[in-house]
Amino acid sequence: MSIEHRLNHIAGQLSGNGDVLLNSVDAHSGEPLPYAFHQATGDEVEAAVQAAEVAYPAYRSTRPAQRAAFLDAIANELDALGDDFIQHVSRETALPEARIRGERSRTSNQLRLFAEVVRWGRARSMRAA
């Protein structure tokens, strides 16, 4: 079985400088799955933090409609992940596929709810109890 190496996404670029690979494992059998992820180096983590600091002012200046559209887009992308995603997560976690589908739906629906809150301007007045 060939192992596909997954890289870190930092400021729109792919990076895999770390020598440590985190292997995806079948939770039931313990056998390796065909994915390994590069553990980020300290420099990669620092680069990601710096990229976030640079990106924040631009995101902060967006209008509520743009932020809501961003949240909706994330929800749509999550929903668009097919059965391969569900099966892979089930193998990695040993959770039943129905549970994974439910968790995905819950997450995408929460993102859409947050988008509506932002869209209608309620986000600024909401406070935790």
Predicted regions, residues:
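N-terminal Rossmann-like NAD(P)+-binding subdomain of aldehyde/semialdehyde dehydrogenases
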Residues: 1-129
